[in-house]
Amino acid sequence: MKLFIQWAGGKAQLLSKLKVPLSYNRYFEPFIGGGALLLNLAPKNAVINDINPDLINLYLQIRDNTDTFIERVRELDEIDCTNEIYLEKRRQYNEGTDSLSKAALMIWLNKRCFNGLYRVNKKGEFNSSYGKKDGKRSSFEESNLRGSSSSFKCRDKDGRFL
């Protein structure tokens, strides 16, 4: 499954070198990032974590509000992006909004920022510069995102995934 978000320090290029136990009852991912190992293994029982609450929110929105999330990102994708528009959307993201809109902005900004790099300043504000990706462009492949969403619906015996 393709990753739907780029993340610095991701494990996608290391998948063939990572050693994973042949059997396990529950998969724990302390630093989910882009989710390369999780999406590759597709475990039946998993718990994920990350220090970035906005990243965890993104996974929650994809899991719990897939259709509305896709709709929000599609609306953003219709914007003819320029540096000025990028900076305005980055400001909106940093000022805060509802959880669903924040997740949609996060993935939209990730596809348009310099090298897909999620970077924050000392205040904890996202400050990655514009990646000169002008115009309209898709932020995700719907079938891939829906496939990811359905795998996130796997839950442990207590009904928890994230």
Where are these regions (language model features)?
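SAM-dependent nucleic-acid methyltransferase catalytic core
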Residues: 1-12, 21-24, 65-162
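A conserved donor-nucleotide-binding helix/loop in the catalytic core
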Residues: 15
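Conserved S-adenosyl-L-methionine
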Residues: 21-78
